Amino acid sequence: MPPMTRKTRIQPIEPVAEEDDNGYDRPSKSQLKREMHELQVLGQALVDLPKDALKRMPMPESLGDAVREARRITDHEGKRRQLQYVGRVMRSLTDDETAALRTALDAQRGVNKAATARLHWIERTREQLLASDDALTEFLRQHPDADIQEGRTLIRNARKEAQQGKPPRYFRELFQWIKAAGGASDSDDEAADDAGDDHDDEA
């Protein structure tokens, strides 16, 4: 009977992380690609910001110049190349600088969302006030400091100008009256401008 031979089980080879000259693990290519894409998206968000909001972003001068140039370019291919350059500039930022930008952008989005919701509320309230006298009673109950006489006058004149097809002067003034009665501040107006929702100019 021939002697039994012991089979050797071949163990799978574990991938070895790349190390740099100092012995630290290098990030994988997929990780680098993902980080580059995230920075590109962040750069695009900066380019898309309203002008006033962009001024409040904590950017180094080199990034600010690159972003403003991207905003200026209208040619599709030229803008695409400039956005790539914005991404390259962003890769030179420190982790703290990138984190500060993300925080500022998140705050800006929150302000815009709140401002847009508030403007929509003002518009809905204006529609209700013009449609029903009962709506004014309810509005005054919720906002007792509002000027009752001014509100009634604006509503009456806004209805009349709509019937006569006149320019919406009182319609717009009613918007401002509702906004003031609701306690809108200057910061609300600024946020509304940033959001691009200049609703009180509509017809």
Curated annotation (Swiss-Prot):
| Known role | Member of a network of 50S ribosomal subunit biogenesis factors which assembles along the 30S-50S interface, preventing incorrect 23S rRNA structures from forming. Promotes peptidyl transferase center (PTC) maturation.
What UniProt keywords apply to this chain's record, in alphabetical order? Cytoplasm, Ribosome biogenesis, RNA-binding, rRNA-binding
**Family statement:** Belongs to the DarP family.
Give me the stretches of Acidic residues compositional bias.
186-203
Q: Does the keyword Cytoplasm apply?
A: yes
Cellular localization per UniProt? Cytoplasm
> What GO molecular function annotation could you give as one example from this UniProt entry?
rRNA binding
User: Could you mention a single GO BP entry for this protein?
Assistant: assembly of large subunit precursor of preribosome
**Which species is listed as the source?**
Burkholderia cenocepacia (strain HI2424)
Gene symbol? darP
Q: Which protein are we looking at?
A: Dual-action ribosomal maturation protein DarP
Taxonomically, the superkingdom here is Bacteria
Which intervals of the chain are annotated as region Disordered?
A: 1-31, 182-203
- One cellular-component annotation, GO: cytosol
